[in-house]
Amino acid sequence: MFNTKIEFSKYDPELWKAIDQEKNRQENHIELIASENYTSNYVMHVQGSQLTNKYAEGYPEKRYYGGCKYVDIIEKLAINRAKKLFNADYANVQPHSGSQANFAVYTALLNPGDTILGMKLSHGGHLTHGSSVNFSGKTYNVIGYGVDKKGNIDYQEILTLAKKYKPKMIIGGFSAYSGICNWSKMRDIADEINAYFVVDIAHVAGLIAANLYPNPIDYAHVVTSTTHKTLAGPRGGLILAKNGTNTFYKKINLSVFPGAQGGPLMHVIAAKAIAFKEALEPAFKIYQKQVIKNAQVMVQSFLKKDYQIVSGNTFNHLFLLDLTSKNITGQEADIALGKCNITVNKNTIPNDLRSPFITSGIRIGTPAVTKRGFKENEMLQISDWIVHILNNIKDKNSLLGIKNEVLKLCSKYPVYI
């Protein structure tokens, strides 16, 4: 019925053109957005497979539809690999995204109006950790913690707020924090007030899988994650836990389905299974080590050039460049760098006086550039380019010259051959 040897460009040239343009953009831009990465061809291939046709509401061997024999095998592969990768004894691979994973966990453990304690978005947290524009901020009573004057998580503040407000849940994790989190200390605080401790590892899941960042699985009641970012898999979500009861795990499962979602995306779950397999291989740890090295090399380069780094260093894949003293907004930096084919995102910094649409900083991450083969020398060159652009932000000729250099570098390191 269907010819699998399709000529996409002829059938829908308008759509194909946009896809091809995006492919070229990825090849010709230096990608420094911390939450972006490049998946393998295996991951992309499986997402375009016949699995996209299959409905499989429920869980393996407990489906509401027939014909699930083979998708059961696929989902169990993904579950078992996820458990092995993160040293967990429970995994749910069905969440469509990290936000969906967080939503499912919150609704499983909380009631509307309950108090939660999460990291402020302006200090490095995530929308789903209590932002007023997100479901988490609209559904629950949110108390926010932040970082101290040195840019490190303020555990004393967490303890003080926990004792004062008695939240039902404390949320660990971040979207823009370059330090190491003390999961043990946060669990102790949660235990002191009899609260759930939930950790969102979306940004550092790949580093944790490679044993290069502390794993919260032995401390958190529940761990959530995305499967892209540092993990370099398909866009999707994941829920993990350890040392819980079957009743507890069933509660989370029911909150995912039927509580938050209907049918799982089996083509994406298969891609997750491949990504977990890739992350279990020795090459993955080598890659993650280089991700951290590349970020740290950039930090030191910026510091030597009199640029400020929030927290002063990085111990993971990202860092925040504080532009306050340079009289440049994050938005201006984002636009100027984009004109030179260097992609970052504007980002608020702790105690930022500018709006989230303007900001006083930019966030820089190294997962994608490391994936395409960049190492220390390339990162030093990129840091030099960024500084030159920001120091000469209105010099169009200078920016054009750097764009040409960026294109030359990108051509030496193709993403997809």
Swiss-Prot record:
Sites bearing N6-(pyridoxal phosphate)lysine, chain numbering: K229
EC code(s) of this entry: 2.1.2.1
Protein localization: Cytoplasm
Sites marked Plays an important role in substrate specificity: H228
Broadest EC class assigned to this enzyme: transferase
Subunit relationships: Homodimer.
Summary of the function given for this chain in its UniProt record: Catalyzes the reversible interconversion of serine and glycine with tetrahydrofolate (THF) serving as the one-carbon carrier. This reaction serves as the major source of one-carbon groups required for the biosynthesis of purines, thymidylate, methionine, and other important biomolecules. Also exhibits THF-independent aldolase activity toward beta-hydroxyamino acids, producing glycine and aldehydes, via a retro-aldol mechanism.
Name this protein carries in UniProt: Serine hydroxymethyltransferase
